[in-house]
């Protein structure tokens, strides 16, 4: 004999069942579309390009055409075939693709810099696995002709110093057109790209080559800053870029003892802040850091690697910003930096992406509501719930 509840379910008209099923499909689809598409627009839409102060030399306001809009992100860590579970890949790569494409569409930057560790297993990749990783990267981080993408090498792309080989470095350079010691100048602003892994200081072939290029570039940049009426003899034959202090872009941060002085909601967690950093592993060595500061006297340094945010002042008041990871796999609240930059000034703003915990909370709440709706529809709720439903129905009828 059928129970009363089952009798109610079986007696529901077919048309009513189909209508209810369509409502459920619409509800589930709406939740999916919101959590996987619209939430990115909702969150990133709140980000704005920061304003730049007046030109230090002329006193005039900078025009939009003279300001370079640059996006900086780091540590995407696309999973590989060894450690990457397919579901983890699907979830994290979809999050980064939607975040990146939404940011490009809403913010329309002139140039985007990715500060290393593009891949998680680049240091181990076979040629076939490397080709697959590159293909996925190019799909996720595709960009319009109005935007330029510049990628800097990290330790997961070519390995730490003891794993780095000429083959791995050239493989990365071929795909991303990256060279340590490369100068990129846009709208009069100079960016210096550094291969942090090659700053070991042990005289290896790759390290010597990278340092020689950096020294030569520092000579050109320093010559460009000389007074036109009092040029030094050694600068007479140098090819001079625009006279603007450079911005240093690299994967490893410059030397600091730890993240103890870092603050903010996306800084390292309290239990990790006081862990001492290891030179040439967590940060550059003191010697390499001093070299870069001495060679270039940068006005700003941007780095990644630690997966957490930090802002420090180096000797001479030179600021360094460590950019958190762009991936949910490494943190719950990823972000990127928006920079409005001129040859003489810059202004930075951090743009947070949707929190993974909030997306999960929406799914849990939607799932719970879905269960309640199904039980209520078939009158399978326990008495207290059913009584509340009857009261609501009577109130609507009145």
UniProtKB/Swiss-Prot annotation:
Binding site residues for a divalent metal cation 2: 75, 117, 251, 307
Gene3D superfamilies xrefs: 3.60.21.10
EC code(s) of this entry: 3.1.-.-
InterPro entries tied to this protein: Calcineurin-like_PHP_ApaH, Metallo-depent_PP-like, MPP_MPPE1, PGAP5/Cdc1/Ted1
GO molecular function, one term: manganese ion binding
Keyword terms: ER-Golgi transport, GPI-anchor biosynthesis, Hydrolase, Manganese, Membrane, Metal-binding, Transmembrane, Transmembrane helix, Transport
UniProt record similarity statement: Belongs to the metallophosphoesterase superfamily. MPPE1 family.
SUPFAM superfamilies for this protein: Metallo-dependent phosphatases (SSF56300)
Listed Pfam families: Metallophos (PF00149)
Principal subcellular localisation of the protein: endoplasmic reticulum
Recorded GO CC terms: endoplasmic reticulum exit site; endoplasmic reticulum-Golgi intermediate compartment membrane; Golgi apparatus
Free-text remark on how the cofactor is bound: Binds 2 manganese ions per subunit.
Identification of the protein by name: Metallophosphoesterase 1
Motif (Di-lysine motif): 394-398
Sequence intervals crossing the membrane: 25-45, 359-379
Coiled-coil positions: none
Function: Metallophosphoesterase that catalyzes the removal of a side-chain ethanolamine-phosphate (EtNP) from the second mannose of the GPI-anchor protein intermediate. Participates in the glycan remodeling steps of GPI-anchor maturation to allow an efficient transport of GPI-anchor proteins from the endoplasmic reticulum to the Golgi.
Domains as described in the record: The di-lysine motif (KxKxx) acts as an endoplasmic reticulum retrieval signal.
Cofactor(s), names only, from the UniProt record: Mn(2+)
A biological process term (GO) from this entry: GPI anchor biosynthetic process
Binding-site positions, a divalent metal cation 1: 117, 155, 251, 305
Membrane topology: Multi-pass membrane protein
Protein localization: Endoplasmic reticulum-Golgi intermediate compartment membrane
